[in-house]
């Protein structure tokens, strides 16, 4: 059986990638005619969801940056083994809300941790599994945070409470990743209206599937 494809959705907080992912599922099923598995990080499976609660709890204000990184990576490992790899081995298209690039952008560019160490730890945890395609939803930090503040249905987490400068560093980190990985990462202007963003994301995935 042909291995499935892994497509990751990345972006700073408030970029709208989660909403776009949800909107894409029926469109992709109609266009590609294959089983689609959607999941998220941190989380996706029971153990990783418990780790997610630890990481994002607003009361955990004293969490060390390296502790945060290692918790994300632990959740990623369990998620990969328990959900992502079985789906890929079954030939499914797997759409993941955040993956390795989030660690590089948030804990690397955002927190200032060593990027080479982050990449090595992720390589170790994932056995070298990389996305086939990454959609990066770019939005100015001010707009992203304004969207979060206006979204009454969103549960505020610990990272949402960080200062603007951290979110700006995260965005810069993502933009650097996009420049360094032009064959894998497709940058999408997420400041557009939702329909335009969904259309751009759909076109990128279909183009990749036909390559």
Curated annotation (Swiss-Prot):
A GO term, aspect molecular function:
ATP binding
The EC class name is transferase
Q: Which domain of life is it from?
A: Bacteria
Q: Which GO terms describe its biological process?
A: dTDP biosynthetic process; dTTP biosynthetic process; dUDP biosynthetic process
The family annotation for this protein states: Belongs to the thymidylate kinase family.
Catalysed reaction(s) here are: dTMP + ATP = dTDP + ADP
One Pfam family name is Thymidylate_kin
Query: What is the official name of this protein in its record?
Result: Thymidylate kinase
